[in-house]
Amino acid sequence: PLIRRLAKYVIDADTTGNGFPDLGVANTFDDAAPAVQFSRKQVYLAVKALAAFEVTALMAESNGDEEFAGICRDRAALIQQTLDTEAWQGDHYAVCLEKRMDEITDPWSGKPAGTGELPGWDAYSIHTANGLLYPLLSGYRLNLDYARLARDIAHATREAMLEYGCTHSSADRSNLWVSQNLWRDFVAAYMGLDLLDMASRYWAFEVMENT
């Protein structure tokens, strides 16, 4: 079945055994800092993977496939453990676990991204909880530390703030996506965080862009 194949792909994308995907990880935040855009072991993608595994386990269980449901639950638990032990920075989740850029390839050029420490690997990101929205909209709460996620959202919002909203992360100081700000705001609402006053910033941005 297609769902099983997709879940297997995400499992195979982790080659280090910590649950975090490190293959095929370049995303569509094409104006973001390298750590956000194409680093390996991204927290943003790990949370998405965890969400995928938990809901796939529910689907497998409802179809009588207890074995595969167990595999998916185990993968979700592994990601959660890595999030708590390796990604948590005390007041926020890091952008990624990859701290060096020596083996990272820029997917746009096909060339090495550089050498030395990866700038922004431990930055504050507004995308951490991105993968939670669809499960939350359907009434399902993933097995995660929501107190930490709420702190992450609050602190990332503060650290990435500019006049018209937040950049991708505190390592990005120019590009802003209103759509991803709104997505963050929706997830925040489910955690009891009221970011409604951000709407005035987004409207001011639209007015500025269209004047």
Task: Set out the residue ranges of the language-model regions.
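Inter-helical turn/loop segments and adjacent helix faces that build the functional surface
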Residues: 56-73
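Extended ligand-binding clefts on enzyme/binding-domain cores
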Residues: 39-46, 77-209
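TPR repeat positional signature
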Residues: 46, 50-53
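A structural signal for well-ordered alpha-helices, especially hydrophobic packing surfaces
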Residues: 53-60, 80-83
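Active-site acid/base region of carbohydrate-active enzymes
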Residues: 1-43, 71-74, 78, 84-105
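Residue-level signature of the C-terminal ends
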Residues: 13, 56-59, 139
